[in-house]
Amino acid sequence: MKRLIMATMVTAILASSTVWAADNAPVAAQQQTQQVQQTQKTAAAAERISEQGLYAMRDVQVARLALFHGDPEKAKELTNEASALLSDDSTEWAKFAKPGKKTNVNDDQYIVINASVGISESYVATPEKEAAIKIANEKMAKGDKKGAMEELRLAGVGVMENQYLMPLKQTRNALADAQKLLDKKQYYEANLALKGAEDGIIVDSEALFVN
């Protein structure tokens, strides 16, 4: 009789466990989906911020070129566009600032506007590493940066990442100065202000992993 009762209890426990798992499977799947969506949303926001900073800096460079070619109106248009890109209040700049980097202006922050990945200078070619680099390039072409980095890491290939950082407040100030000078038709001085914005960019190199 005891065996029958125990068997019945075990069956009941197993049955309830199955029901619990079935009931919670959609919840777990939903949570995982939400996490993936949040990660994608964060990555998209960071990418948008980088693009805004990069486009603003391109506008600065082309504005200087326009001044060189005697087209101040085009330079003014591009400078205003760059300023608008960096003054977008809907953008959460601080959330995606590069931490731990000292800036020249108080309360400033560096924003990553571009990045490049390369092999470390100590790299020594071997057939295995060359094969890993080929596979990594294929994965990068498909947008799988994480997979590409893992391929290189497993093959013992040292990788460096160069991040191009823009001091947000300093660049905004330089653009504001350039706008005022362009309005006053002080084009030489405006060019220097734009150059100051361009010169504020720094390159931060970091070893992702070493061989």
Swiss-Prot record:
It comes from the Bacteria. Keywords: Signal. Gene3D superfamilies: 6.10.250.2140, YfdX protein domain. Disulfide bonds: none annotated. Residues 1-21 form the signal peptide. This is Protein YfdX. The gene is yfdX.
